[in-house]
């Protein structure tokens, strides 16, 4: 929560812990929403403790979430494979090939590395992908109805051109 001078005056938080399921570090979508509820509850408690009042109205709300990982959705909005977090080290082959191709370091945590690794493995969900998001993009989509991500989150998906503040067109 920020005050009129844009300085923080209260905060909420949640300690995330991903789960290793079938060799993939992941969070369930239920865990994502449980975490957001816990974070908001923590904010309410912080405000009550510091100021003795209760939040009744918010002008705007922002979220900070992972800018790396892999959340592939079909056109109905169904998650096609479990969320693959930044912690996974299953994209080594893709990371190396893309780094060589682009002459630019592509870390294993980048969304493009996860997508290309799925392509190399010919994963069956690929033909159904309508959108690919990070956790930050997913939360924004669910809260606003828009599939957009900021430049910070976008840098975890694909290399960014610093001058244009867009995806690097020479690498697309």
Locate the predicted segments by residue.
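N-terminal glycine/serine-rich phosphate-binding loop of ATP-dependent small-molecule kinases
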Residues: 1-81, 96, 128
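Conserved donor sugar-nucleotide recognition element shared by glycan-biosynthetic enzymes
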Residues: 29-32, 36, 91, 111-114
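A non-catalytic, amphipathic alpha-helix used as a structural packing/dimerization or gating element
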Residues: 35-38, 93, 166, 170
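Gly/Ser/Thr-rich active-site cleft segment
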Residues: 63, 73, 102-172
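Residues that scaffold the ATP/ADP-binding catalytic core of kinase and kinase-like folds
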Residues: 82, 94, 142
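Carbohydrate-associated surface elements
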Residues: 88
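Phosphate- and other anionic-substrate recognition elements at nucleic-acid/protein interfaces
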Residues: 99
